[in-house]
Amino acid sequence: MKKLKKWSLGFLSFILLFLGATFIFHRISLEKEKASLTPMGQHVLVNGHQINVYVEGDGLETIVVLSGAGIASPILDFKEVSESLSKQYKVVIVERAGYGYSDDSNYSRDVMEVLSETRQALSQANITGPFIILSHSMASLESLAWQEKYPDEVKVLIGLDWALPSSYENLKQNQALLTLAYWSS
């Protein structure tokens, strides 16, 4: 019995040491990676945090690309789209708080708060409308709210795999599940 207890304690110590070493290695690697990353776009200050705004092209009309939830780096995910459209339009990609090169935020992530931050970021970057809004997935809720609340700022809405407003209600009902998914990733 003593031998089993001693072996179990040794095994547990090994596991804890291994996990600690892995954690330290991971933190060091993250710092090294952070130093090597060169942000694309410009940072503007919105509600005390940095929002990244990427502009490509110099057309007379401006397309604002809004990515859906779960897009880690909107600039990179929509790079081919922005390159193609930038031949004729000014293409702007706003990376919301917590995405891409933007800072995280403790502010509410409801549609009106996100819309307010997007509009402030565009204003801080001296980008004026009216805009052609190209929105993907859950960003459709933001673009619909934008059209409804500020119709003079929206020229056209273009949807890519849009989520319907009822989707947002489902998110509210499943907030605990979403929080668990966030922390487990």
Residue ranges and their predicted role:
Residues 96-132:
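Active-site loop/oxyanion-hole signature of alpha/beta-hydrolase fold enzymes
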Residues 2-63, 87-89:
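Alpha/beta-hydrolase fold catalytic core
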Residues 111, 150-185:
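Flexible "cap/lid" subdomain of the alpha/beta-hydrolase fold that forms the substrate-access gate
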Residues 133-135, 160:
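Short beta-strand immediately N-terminal to the catalytic nucleophile in serine-hydrolase-like folds
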Residues 85, 146-147:
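Aromatic pocket-lining residues of Rossmann-like dinucleotide-binding sites
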Residues 49-101:
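Conserved HGGG/HGGXW glycine-rich cap/lid loop of the alpha/beta-hydrolase fold
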Residues 135-139, 143:
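Gly/Ala-rich beta-loop-alpha elbow adjacent to hydrolase catalytic centers
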